[in-house]
Amino acid sequence: MSGNLRTRRTVRHSRALGIALTPKAEKYMERRPYGPGQHGRARRKQDSDYAVRLKEKQRLRAQYNIREAQMRRYFEEAKRTAGLTGENLVELLEQRLDALVLRAGFARTIQQARQLVVHRHIMVDGKRVDVPSFRVKEGQMIHVHERSEKMVPFQLAAAGAHQQVLPATPGYLTVEIEKLRATLTRRPKRSEVPVTCEEQLVVEYYAR
């Protein structure tokens, strides 16, 4: 898929969900703050409770770029964990390696973060990890393989180019961007995680 086509699809998906999934999509949405298609400007009819919950689930899924089967597994684990299921769900998703690569500013989008992991540019505590869903534990360090550091995308990242367009680094990550290193210092708290989601609606969707 060409870069332009991928961008158009992402922008269209962002407008349909009502959230910017990439910095580029955010710029498009500032210019066109309404849904896609010829009826995007029209006043929408009231969504059913089911439609509202479904959309919220889709929004959360899209922000982590995961499949439905993966999402359901995370939900089942969140349900078994002590505490509020919705908060647990977001906190578990946030410990994915690709999510933390994005939060650290090594990538500009969750899709790019996933590719960096799959192509074996990312290490955890000195070992290559090529599984985007790898769960990072407290105290583990994420860093770029030394052979990859000279690549243009990582040179841009080390200069802070991605951090300039992403949300501020959350408190559970300590980042040395010029060294392309980040450490998960503690478990993420839902209130700190920079995703747009009413997680209780997601819980209600799966509990139906």
Swiss-Prot record:
GO cellular component, one term: small ribosomal subunit
Any one Gene Ontology BP term: translation
PROSITE patterns, per the entry: RIBOSOMAL_S4, S4
InterPro entries per UniProt: Ribosomal_uS4, Ribosomal_uS4_bac-type, Ribosomal_uS4_CS, Ribosomal_uS4_N, S4_RNA-bd, S4_RNA-bd_sf
S4 RNA-binding domain: residues covered: 95-155
Chain spans, region Disordered: 29-48
Protein family according to the UniProt entry: Belongs to the universal ribosomal protein uS4 family.
Function of the molecule: One of the primary rRNA binding proteins, it binds directly to 16S rRNA where it nucleates assembly of the body of the 30S subunit.
Subunit structure: Part of the 30S ribosomal subunit. Contacts protein S5. The interaction surface between S4 and S5 is involved in control of translational fidelity.
PANTHER family: 30S 40S RIBOSOMAL PROTEIN, SMALL RIBOSOMAL SUBUNIT PROTEIN US4M
Protein name: Small ribosomal subunit protein uS4
Organism from which the protein derives: Micrococcus luteus (strain ATCC 4698 / DSM 20030 / JCM 1464 / CCM 169 / CCUG 5858 / IAM 1056 / NBRC 3333 / NCIMB 9278 / NCTC 2665 / VKM Ac-2230) (Micrococcus lysodeikticus)
